[in-house]
Amino acid sequence: MFFKLVLVSAVAIQALSMSILKSNVKRDQKQLQPCQENQICHEVPNSKYEAPPLVHCLCTGGKRCPMDTSLAHKTTGSGDTLMYLFRCI
C-alpha cells in the first residue's frame, strides 16, 4: 500500500513538472515577435556554437535566420567578446 502511494505521488509530481515546463516553453515562444525590417533575429557570442544563440525575433515571410557566421555582422560586446549578429534572409 505504501509503495503504491509513493508511486502515485511520483507520477503526479512528474506530470505537474512536465506541465510547468510546457507552459514555460509556450510563454517564451509567445514573447517572440516577428522580426521588423533589418532587426537582429539572433546573436551568437564568441564562436559559432560556443553558447546558445540569443533569439530576438522570428523570421517570417519565408525568410530564415542563418547560422552561417560568414553571413553575420560581427561586433565586439562587453570585454571584447565577439558577437555574431544575424538578420533574416
From Swiss-Prot:
Location relative to the cell: Secreted
Tissue: Expressed by the venom gland.
Lineage: superkingdom: Eukaryota
PTM summary: Contains 3 disulfide bonds.
GO terms for cellular component: extracellular region
Signal peptide start and end residues: 1-17
GO molecular function term, any single one: toxin activity
Keyword annotations of the record: Disulfide bond, Secreted, Signal, Toxin
Family statement: Belongs to the scoloptoxin-11 family.
Name of the protein in question: U-scoloptoxin(11)-Sm4a
